[in-house]
Every structure is written in C-alpha cells, then in structure tokens.
Amino acid sequence: MAKLSKRAAAIAKKIDRTKLYPVSEALTLVKETATAKFDESIDVAVQLGIDPKKSDQLVRGSVVLPAGTGKSVRVAVFAQGDKAEAARAAGADIVGLDDLAERIKGGQIDFDVVIASPDTMRVVGALGQVLGPRGLMPNPKVGTVTPDVATAVKNAKAGQVQYRTDKAGIIHATIGRASFGVEQLQTNLAALVDALQKARPAAAKGIYLRKLAVSSTMGGGARIEVASLSAN
C-alpha cells in the first residue's frame, strides 16, 4: 500500500470517509483541512436521482449565492445601443458586438462569464466552437441570454454560479472559499440545494438528493447527511 503524504495522513485522521456528517460539521472539517498557502475553494458534489441519459431529466440552471463566491468575476457582454450602455453601467468589464467577436476569435479570452442580448445571437452563435468547450457559451437556461443584460451582469458580479448535471448525474459547484465562515458556506449551500430542488425534472422518480459531499481544492472531502440540510 502506498505511503500517505503528511497532508493526506492528517486528513485521513480527521475525516472518516465512510461517515455521513451533519452539514455544519462537514463544512468545519473541510475548512480545517484546507491548509494550503492560498485561499482554497470549497466545492460541493451532489448526486441527483435522475437518469442522465434522458434529455428530459437533465438539470441545468444558475443561482446567486447569498455570501458570494469569494472570486472577482470579469464579465463580457454582447450588446448594442441602450443595452450596451446599461451593461456598462451595471459593471460589465467588456462590452461589444462584432469587435468583441473578433477579439474572441483572436484568442483574447480574458473573462469568466459571457452574457448576450437575444438580438446579438446571430454573432454569438458563430463562436460556439470557441466558447462552448470553455463553458462560456451564453444560454437562456442559465440567464446569460437575456434582454435584461444589466441584471445579468449584476448577478454575475454578485456571485452567481452555473450548474449542470454531468454524464453521471452529478452537479459540481463552488460554494465559497476556505476563508469563509461556516455559516456563509452553509447559506450558500442551502441556496444551491434550494435551486436544485426547484429545478427537479417532472420525470425524476424516487429520492432526488441522493448524495452530497464537500471538499476543498487541496484538502479533504466529507460526505453530508442529506437529512441535516433541512434541519438547518
């Protein structure tokens, strides 16, 4: 058996991977094992009771985390006229149309979120091969294709996260940083879980929230007792 590193050994001593922890205890343990020299992200994985092979059971959307993400977000907006001005006033970092498209085609992708007004999709649609693989393609399901670009910009800046089920029916999302307090992380997790509950597909049968686990970038992961979510 391979010898555990000091970090892994310390984590294994503190977190029992076979145990289900109440949500507050799980978050506390994950924070305590996030000992890297940078502010590690705190991530959650949620196993949903869906059939990911069926298109009518895929879960996708976005939610604004009440305590934010702890990350500075750069936002690019495809808009023109009054909508472009509204986007700038809301705090967008880059606003344009054909010029922004050329910038992206040239490989200058220095932003984290792309928002588009519906009337610009004729231009944005041609960028699918560039933006799609990076998870940046605007989509109405997550609120990034909208006539209200100003609100979309404010949401992105305020800590909005996008989520979608992977091929195994699991949602992966960041709910904050190791520097956050347990209550902040718990509030963000509750907001995400609430959004997932509201996005439950009508065709999904049986238990919907099957498994939850939280982890940090370099630290340990702890499984959460699902029932403890509603108890808080």
Swiss-Prot record:
GO terms for biological process: regulation of translation; translation. Pfam families: Ribosomal_L1. InterPro entries: Ribosom_uL1_bac-type, Ribosomal_uL1, Ribosomal_uL1-like, Ribosomal_uL1/biogenesis, Ribosomal_uL1_3-a/b-sand, Ribosomal_uL1_CS. The keyword Membrane does not apply. One of its GO terms (cellular component) is cytosolic large ribosomal subunit. PROSITE patterns: RIBOSOMAL_L1 (PS01199). SUPFAM superfamilies: Ribosomal protein L1. One of its GO terms (molecular function) is tRNA binding. Keywords: Repressor, Ribonucleoprotein, Ribosomal protein, RNA-binding, rRNA-binding, Translation regulation, tRNA-binding. Belongs to the universal ribosomal protein uL1 family. Part of the 50S ribosomal subunit. Binds directly to 23S rRNA. The L1 stalk is quite mobile in the ribosome, and is involved in E site tRNA release. Protein L1 is also a translational repressor protein, it controls the translation of the L11 operon by binding to its mRNA. NCBIfam families: rplA_bact (TIGR01169). This is Large ribosomal subunit protein uL1. The lineage of its organism: Bacteria, Pseudomonadati, Pseudomonadota, Betaproteobacteria, Burkholderiales.
